[in-house]
């Protein structure tokens, strides 16, 4: 019995130790900057940095149906809520690269003035750069998983990352590696299916 308990304890210890290994090696200079920035933030600002709003809230459509950033509305949102990140394209439509540059520049200018920290933009680019006009589209991840081809998964993800970064957006909500074990889940097509091994391999 003692041997079993000892074995379990050692396994738990090994698991805990491996869980604390960072994926990317930390940079002491960057860590120091982060700590300095955190010390300057109020509790309200820290809470705001953990919030995310959709792009639609920062503007409206003009008479031609083209979205624009409303600087008064944006200033009001950022000064009141200190938002840390913004999600997806306005009206769930795909802006051009120039439109993205303009939207982001306008919001960042106000964010830097109000909080001193740039907002992070994220897009649901789960199967290609779907939120940019002229972007490359790929099959949904459930279809990619059906190929059992890791190379296809990797190369389509690389292309998506490249095209997303090309429009000044550093973050995509992909890959979705939660297991699809309930067909009622509304994101079922965005993952790699119900098999944990397949999902882990395709999501590497």
Model-derived segments and their meaning:
Residues 20-204:
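N-terminal beta-rich core of secreted/periplasmic extracellular enzymes
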Residues 1-23:
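Bacterial Sec-dependent N-terminal signal peptides
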């Amino acid at each position: 019995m003692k041997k079993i308990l000892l074995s379990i304890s050692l396994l738990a210890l090994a698991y805990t130790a491996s869980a604390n290994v960072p994926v990317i090696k930390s940079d002491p200079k960057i860590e120091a900057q982060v700590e300095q920035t955190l010390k300057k933030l109020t509790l309200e600002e820290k809470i705001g940095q953990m919030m995310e709003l959709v792009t639609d809230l920062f503007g409206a459509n003009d008479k031609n149906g083209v979205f624009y950033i409303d600087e008064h509305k944006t200033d009001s949102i950022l000064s009141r809520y200190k938002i840390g990140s913004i999600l997806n394209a306005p009206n769930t439509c795909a802006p051009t690269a120039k439109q993205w540059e303009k939207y982001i520049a306008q919001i960042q200018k106000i964010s830097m003035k109000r909080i001193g920290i740039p907002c992070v933009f994220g897009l649901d680019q789960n199967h290609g750069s779907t939120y940019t006009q002229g972007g490359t589209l790929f099959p949904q991840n459930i279809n990619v998983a059906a190929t059992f081809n890791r190379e296809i998964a990797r190369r389509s993800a690389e292309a998506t990352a490249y095209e997303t970064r090309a429009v000044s957006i550093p973050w995509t909500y992909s890959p979705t590696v939660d297991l699809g074990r309930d067909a009622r889940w509304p994101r079922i097509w965005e993952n790699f299916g119900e098999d944990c091994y397949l999902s882990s391999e395709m999501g590497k």
